Amino acid sequence: MNDMEMIKALTLPEGKVDAVLDTDAYNEVDDQFAIAYMLRSDEKINVKEIYAAPFYNDNSDGPADGMEKSYEEIKHILTLLKREDMIEKTYRGSCNYLQDEFTPVESE
């Protein structure tokens, strides 16, 4: 990428931007705020899809359980925000982490 291409890539877009959110919403509260902020900023952001991400800590039994809990939490937040229309654009992410930078993990 040359200097002009980099400057163009870093220029703020005009109007609404399309966005996809990949979130472990059940893990920590920051993701819940991100979902609410994005959906309440519809003059700036066009949320295309939301994906539940895996996580593993004391709140889950493993990455797959963390992803499923995040998926359910996303749907709960969408209901609270009265944005049930986004539930059909919400997907389960992968049940495992990437093994390396070359091997994809299946998801919805």
Language model: regions and residue ranges:
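N-terminal acidic, glycine/proline-rich low-complexity segments
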Residues: 1-108
